[in-house]
Amino acid sequence: MRVEILSSKIHRATVTDANLNYVGSITIDEELMRAANLLENQKVEILDVNNGERFATYVIKGKKGEICLNGAAARKVCIGDIVIIVAYASMKFKKAKKFSPTIVHVNAKNEMIKK
């Protein structure tokens, strides 16, 4: 049996921009992507702590400190909102029981404070 399990999380990032006119995605600081083991174009779920929205999109590389929701997703957040960015992996149940996700904590400037 296979299960979906949390593989990566950026915890409590601050939305720095919302660009309605971009094609889509979430732009994430490249350093945070690397720390969280997120790949460009990888599917992620966005959880907005401020308004309760939950939605899926894909990742693109951004500049230092950047967390920007693009395209239609820009309507789901406000600049300054706190979001949790999560990715899941499908794995066999036995492996999932031993798996530890990568969790990156950030401060209000989207700087890594704990991994």
Curated annotation (Swiss-Prot):
Annotated keywords: Autocatalytic cleavage, Cytoplasm, Decarboxylase, Lyase, Pantothenate biosynthesis, Pyruvate, Schiff base, Zymogen
A cellular component annotation (GO) from this entry: cytosol
Post-translational modification: Is synthesized initially as an inactive proenzyme, which is activated by self-cleavage at a specific serine bond to produce a beta-subunit with a hydroxyl group at its C-terminus and an alpha-subunit with a pyruvoyl group at its N-terminus.
Active site per the UniProt annotation: 25 (schiff-base intermediate with substrate), 58 (proton donor)
GO molecular function, one term: aspartate 1-decarboxylase activity
GO biological process: alanine biosynthetic process; pantothenate biosynthetic process
Residues binding substrate: 57, 71-73
Residues found modified as Pyruvic acid (Ser): 25
Pathway: Cofactor biosynthesis; (R)-pantothenate biosynthesis; beta-alanine from L-aspartate: step 1/1
Cofactor annotation remark: Binds 1 pyruvoyl group covalently per subunit.
Enzyme Commission number(s): 4.1.1.11
Primary localization: cytoplasm
Family annotation (Pfam families): Asp_decarbox (PF02261)
Location(s), subcellular: Cytoplasm
Homology family: Belongs to the PanD family.
Primary role: Catalyzes the pyruvoyl-dependent decarboxylation of aspartate to produce beta-alanine.
Protein name, entry field: Aspartate 1-decarboxylase
